[in-house]
Amino acid sequence: MENFDKTMKFDYEELPTQDVRDVLNNVYRTLDERGYNAVNQIVGYLLSGDPAYIPRQNEARNQIRHIDRDVIMEELVSYYLKEQNK
């Protein structure tokens, strides 16, 4: 039986931070150009994994699907915390 009192380490194969940022910026711009609330759409995608939240325009859907959602969330949380602790 496993001990659930121990902290598990989450590890993943890192993508270059700039690649994740470039994709998120492209997705954001594309959603904004289409008149969507970009933050709501990205959150919807991250929570559900449903690519229908992201348009195909500018290859936004293809790009974001090539990055694991955990990697995107890690980048967003990391960036937010670094900005808050400057």
Curated annotation (Swiss-Prot):
The protein's matches in InterPro entries, at most eight in alphabetical order, are given as: IreB
- Superkingdom of this protein's organism: Bacteria
NCBIfam families, per the entry: PRK05473.1 (NF003997)
In the record, the note on similarity to other proteins reads:
Belongs to the UPF0297 family.
Which named protein is this? UPF0297 protein SAOUHSC_01721
Origin species, per record, is Staphylococcus aureus (strain NCTC 8325 / PS 47)
